From Swiss-Prot:
Domain I is involved in oligomerization and binding regulators, domain II is flexibile and of varying length in different bacteria, domain III forms the AAA+ region, while domain IV binds dsDNA. Residues 116-333 are annotated as: Domain III, AAA+ region. CDD domains: Bac_DnaA_C. Disulfide bonds: none annotated. The gene is dnaA. ATP binds at residues 160, 162-164. GO terms for cellular component: cytoplasm; plasma membrane. Residues 1-76 are annotated as: Domain I, interacts with DnaA modulators. One of its GO terms (biological process) is regulation of DNA replication. Keywords: ATP-binding, Cytoplasm, DNA replication, DNA-binding, Lipid-binding, Nucleotide-binding. This is Chromosomal replication initiator protein DnaA. InterPro entries: AAA+_ATPase, Chromosome_initiator_DnaA, Chromosome_initiator_DnaA-like, Chromosome_initiator_DnaA_CS, DnaA_C, DnaA_dom, DnaA_N_dom, DnaA_N_sf.
Amino acid sequence: MSGDAAALWPRVAEGLRRDLGARTFDHWLKPVRFADYCALSGVVTLETASRFSANWINERFGDRLELAWRQQLPAVRSVSVRGGVAATERAATLASVPLPTFDAPAAPAANPALLGFDPRLSFDRFVVARSNILAANAARRMAMVERPQFNPLYLCSGTGQGKTHLLQAIAQDYAAAHPTATIILMSAEKFMLEFVGAMRGGDMMAFKARLRAADLLLLDDLQFVIGKNSTQEELLHTIDDLMTAGKRLVVTADRPPAMLDGVEARLLSRLSGGLVADIEAPEDDLRERIIRQRLAAMPMVEVPDDVIAWLVKHFTRNIRELEGALNKLLAYAALTGARIDLMLAEDRLAENVRSARPRITIDEIQRAVCAHYRLDRSDMSSKRRVRAVARPRQVAMYLAKELTPRSYPEIGRRFGGRDHSTVIHAVRTVEALRVADSELDAEIAAIRRSLNS
């Protein structure tokens, strides 16, 4: 019966194109493919490559899809569109395995989606610039080199900067280069839940065996194990066993290992033993190139240069925020037939701009601190260690971390090329002093008020 329904999809699509118009249909529904029809439930399942597209199609065209299908097949009760990796769940039946372990097939040219990976998150689609070149190059080496000189690889950045993209890219390239390898890609939260479930279910041996069978373990968002002592202990043993066996480990987190308060020292030592690569906030050039790369894959969509420049100017904190704004603009234009221009962007993305507006810059913080303590601006970058200069400099570093999205290495560079560990020390020192020294706490509060005024 599924085959009969599949044969109807071209007719359904033709009717939708006629009803919705060629432009809207071609942009949203042309990439959709028939997946399945269950005669028992009356549910038609369609597939598209993007979760974003799937969500929009379900929300905006769900009723139209059901009506179009019922005109061809009256038994249809509902239509569902799924996107991303869900589109290949038929070929990668992983539900029976508690941990998402992916065994690459023998064919070197296997489709990454069939392994449970998102083929869009590849190295080819990761735009490289100064802010992320260390992390990108290290990730490529981890995926391809027979014996990487650094292991584990620790990627850290704020949210939406591309850490998960690099994890997926590593997994896909490693699977292509090592067809018989076992790859595990999971979040630290998933590791914790699986560990707790194995303990309660008396299945620890199977849990340990699955993890230790990995040739490549990729662990996302390590900060989720902060304060989870038993999970950290098991993770430490897992890492030790993998490293001893010559296996590869890649970890991501939202901060450097030294700032993971609540994580056991031995685990931090293991994670710091390879390479710690920071991804900084994206510069203007990188943000523009990301937009143009996205648009190059959509030749039917026209976005003027002044709109691209406006997006680059107003969405500076992270890539996810930028792509979200672009998606919203493209979706509105596709669904309403509106022409994309600067006026439309300013109107439809006004709320996004308000939430994305950069709070304060490091330059502004340095100026405010120097004004408060009557220092010269050069003191922020100087090597002078006298207390009258060193303490205000620490306060400025602390405020830079509190009030901007900049990473520790980036802040250090803005303070005379100081190492990220110096910035970490400054932040911790000022945090402690604010509790113990009410006068300093009041001074910092006054500086913050001046910055917000």
